[in-house]
A protein has these predicted regions:
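Bacterial Sec-dependent N-terminal signal peptides
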Residues: 3, 16, 20-49, 187, ...
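Long, intrinsically disordered, low-complexity segments
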Residues: 26-27, 48, 86, 111-114, ...
Length: 509
């Protein structure tokens, strides 16, 4: 059902040369995150039911990600190669950094655009508070905004080694730079404040905003911050809240978790939601998955869009999985071309019979000059396209945080000496392994968990890279001709941002 909403554009804020404008969307349906709306300059803060509109605007901005973001965050791990013709990404993959690289500037700028948008949304929600007569609901909406903002800060700090934690929009240029530890402490504190005000359910059980932020999204982000701080008891505390809630379970079908069937799955703690609105033409809200795809494929559905070939699983990862006897996770994570199969046979030897250049659905992946392998977690089978749609990944959500990651984070923390909660490290790891069809482990070590995370979470949002930085695993990141040193752990602040924000020039203290 379409609604016509009349709300204002938020006041533009100048940050690093970009005018920031918040655009508000609204939804009524599970599978329709946002619909087209009309805008005017009039706002009536006495209309209590409109208090949700600024929150919807925050979600709209949060879900509107740029294609280069997940690639930039992911390409430096030993699970991914930067393929294609994007020279800055190829240089970053080889740990050659330049402050002038366009994609790192984009990641910084777009994250801060959303942070400023969220600040504005919080301010707007508070303007409706009195008319709403519902302080608890206003507090919930603000808590949801804080969770989104915390995730954005988490990304920036892990990528650049620190960032500016904004305290007021009119004081950005005077706000001192925070190092990564300080940012993580801020995130932990923000989530502690937000958690009591959030819905205490799985995101897919929310009726008002299906898939929206909940208590457990906040706990997951808090756990990630604790992990970056190497506060492993904090990791156990936060992940235990998720584990003990009974709200989450591993999907029985790892392969289809990353397809349309995985939308709002019980395993997903946070995901960016997209939709074709169940129609073959007209409005759609989506992410541009083309950079993950392979050009020149032969899809089952004639005319289905191909891809650009910018994101390639590494030979190291594939051979690691073959050594473990992995099947479903390797099939899900890696798409093979004929040249890739030949390269593997020459380097590794005999391959399992199931390895082929055709997926389960019948799409054929032909040779491509840009890459020999592609990330299956990001390539939607053509048969899942709504008739009339042709864009790669159209109608596909983008999973950000999964229950499997929380289980493995919990297990690692216990192996590092944290007091266990309701389950052992063995139990947590073996839950994930059982889904993959692997045998149980006993006496799990930290290395066992890191290996399991490598197998389970490869190609997902730079998780492997962040683990290797946290553990200072220099030798792991030095692979396939690449040489890593810890002074390359973080990207430099973008030159365009340093020019606008003088505190960045001083660097991380």
């Amino acid at each position: 059902m379409k609604k016509k909403l009349f709300i204002k554009y938020f006041t533009p804020v100048l940050l690093s040369g970009l005018l920031l404008v918040s655009v508000i969307g609204c939804t009524d349906k599970l599978d329709e995150p946002f619909e087209n709306e009309s805008f005017t300059s009039d706002v009536d803060y006495t209309i209590a039911e409109d208090m949700v509109l600024p929150l919807m605007g925050a979600y709209y901005g949060f879900y509107t990600r740029q294609w280069e973001e997940p690639l930039t965050l992911g390409i430096r791990g030993d699970d991914v190669n930067a393929a294609g013709d994007q020279v800055p990404m190829q240089e970053q993959d080889n740990f050659t950094y330049m402050a002038s690289h366009w994609n790192t500037n984009s990641v910084w700028q777009n994250h801060y655009n959303d942070i400023v948008n969220i600040f504005t949304a919080i301010d707007e929600i508070n303007k409706y508070r009195e008319a709403s007569g519902n302080n608890a609901l206003a507090d919930q909406y603000i808590a949801e905004c804080k969770v989104m903002r915390a995730y954005l800060y988490l990304n920036i700090a892990r990528t650049f080694g620190g960032c500016i934690v904004i305290d007021a929009l009119d004081n950005i240029q005077n706000t001192p730079l925070s190092n990564k530890e300080q940012v993580m402490q801020y995130i932990v504190s923000e989530m502690t404040d937000a958690i009591p005000n959030l819905p205490d359910v799985h995101p897919n059980k929310r009726i008002d905003i299906p898939g929206g932020m909940t208590t457990y999204t906040a706990y997951a982000i808090q756990a990630l911050a604790y992990q970056e701080m190497e506060d492993y008891q904090g990791v156990v505390s936060a992940t235990s809240q998720i584990i003990n809630s009974g709200e989450f379970q591993l999907s029985e079908d790892y392969y289809h978790l990353f397809k349309v069937a995985g939308k709002l799955d019980d395993e997903n703690i946070m995901e960016f939601q997209y939709s074709d609105f169940n129609q073959g033409e007209g409005d759609r809200f989506g992410f541009l998955f083309a950079p993950f795809g392979i050009g020149g494929w032969t899809p089952v559905v004639t005319g289905a869009g191909a891809g650009w070939g910018f994101y390639e699983p590494t030979m190291k990862y594939i051979e690691f999985m073959l050594d473990r006897g992995e099947s479903v996770r390797l099939e899900t994570s890696v798409i093979f071309t004929p040249d890739g199969i030949t390269e593997l046979q020459n380097d590794y030897g005999t391959l399992p019979e199931w390895i082929d250049n055709t997926n389960r659905e019948g799409d054929i992946f032909n040779n491509n000059a840009r890459l020999n392998f592609a990330s299956g977690k990001h390539i939607q089978p053509s048969t899942e396209l709504i008739p009339g749609r042709t864009s790669l990944g159209s109608n596909k959500n983008f999973i950000v945080i999964r229950y499997a990651e929380m289980l493995l984070m919990y297990a690692e923390a216990v192996t590092r000496g944290a007091s266990a909660g309701s389950m052992s490290a063995d139990d947590a790891v073996n839950m994930v392994r059982a889904r993959a069809g692997l045998t149980n482990l006993s006496g799990v070590t930290t290395q066992d968990v890191l290996d399991e995370k490598f197998a389970e979470l490869a190609m997902e949002w730079g998780t492997r890279y962040y683990d290797m930085i946290r553990t200072e695993s220099v030798s792991e990141l030095s692979h396939e001709g690449k040489t890593f040193t810890m002074d390359k752990a973080y990207l430099p602040f973008p030159a365009d941002q340093v020019a606008e924000l003088p505190q960045l020039e001083e660097g991380i203290q």
